[in-house]
Amino acid sequence: MRSAAACNNAGWCAAVSRSHGCPDTVDDAAWCSARRTPPYYPDAVTLRPDATPTDILDRIDTTSPGCSVKDSFATLDLTPDGFVELFTAEWIHRPAGLPAPASTALTVLTVRQVTTAAELHDWQSAWHGEDTPVDIFRPALLREPSVRIFTAHVNGDSGDSGDDRPAGGFVLTCDGDVVGLSNLFAADSSRRSDVWTAAITEAAAHCPGLPLVGYEQGDDLARARAHGFAPIGALRVWLHQPGQP
């Protein structure tokens, strides 16, 4: 299942990178982008535990600041190649058919699929959570057949009220084998568990019969476990240091 999760995540990273025009390659060892990817996104994702630095490093641009590698099985040592460990996390898996936990919120979240560039702009602004605009999620993503982006709104929020900002959101990537859950956020941290429940519900509706996968760390790993996910193995993200080989 960890291989399926890694492959699904590589597909999502590839979709984001394609929307920026990044040329990429994929084989049984890794997905790689020949040009620096958008912020927060890796330049390579390994797809098998025996992938080696040789499988990756000649296919990515280590000369540009921010170059990173997602080591999906936490088996690489990229220290000799000028990388440092940025963080570790756990792949997670939730079986298909497991009911979503009931929400304990006094007000229910309404979920909407993002379908327009304007809606994607609002989603991205809410996801980033800062005044400085970001350019990561571009409208071309809305044409990716495997990608579905969702906003969650508190019931009663509408354009008529003058405040239709998302209360939360998430991304589902359905590749036919598993559904990847990523980029989950809540504008109010007290609603984060409700957004998890909403994401599980939408995954079952849009990609029925498929297990959910993703990766988390810290408090969000604990929330994932509370919502029926189980850890299935570690991953590691490596960041290249400027001036290194």
Regions found by a protein language model. Give the residues of each.
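N-terminal charged segments
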Residues: 1-63, 72, 129-146
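Acyl-donor-binding surface of acyltransferase catalytic domains
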Residues: 47-117, 212-222, 229-241
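Alpha-helix C-terminal capping segments
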Residues: 56-64, 127, 200-208
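A short, well-structured alpha-helix characteristic of acyl/acetyltransferase catalytic modules
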Residues: 116-126
